[in-house]
Swiss-Prot record:
Region (Disordered): 1-106
GO molecular function: DNA binding
Subcellular compartments: Nucleus; Chromosome
Lineage: Eukaryota, Metazoa, Spiralia, Lophotrochozoa, Mollusca
Repeat keyword on record: yes
Major site of localization recorded for this protein: nucleus
GO CC annotation, single: nucleus
Annotated protein name in UniProt: Protamine
Keyword Repeat: yes
Length: 106
């Protein structure tokens, strides 16, 4: 079970990096295509937009499902405290700082 957890942790870090890289790669590729397309630009761009939106929807749904499964697994294993602290600490900290700033201005 520990080996599986380690593999998942590694895959998470890699997946985050690969997402950011893939987005930048897509942008550069689209620019190259648009330059080489020339007269046929309009037809190709319409089809590209449709394809992209479909792929994005799929990726979003997959991410949501994964998160829900992970949260269920943590409760069973009893490691919920450590992992939750790591994930939610940043969000909570940001929220608090925003609130404090607003109060100070008022």
């Amino acid at each position: 079970a520990r080996a599986v957890r380690r593999r998942r942790a590694r895959s998470r870090s890699r997946s985050r990096k690969s997402r950011s890289r893939s987005r930048s790669a897509k942008r550069s590729a689209s620019r190259r295509r648009s330059r080489s397309a020339g007269r046929r630009r309009r037809r190709r761009t319409a089809s590209r937009r449709r394809r992209r939106s479909a792929s994005r929807r799929r990726s979003v749904s997959r991410r949501r499902r994964r998160r829900s499964r992970k949260s269920r697994g943590r409760r069973r294993r009893g490691r919920k405290v450590r992992r939750r602290r790591v994930k939610r600490a940043g969000r909570k900290g940001r929220r608090r700082t925003r609130r404090r700033r607003r109060r100070a201005r008022r």
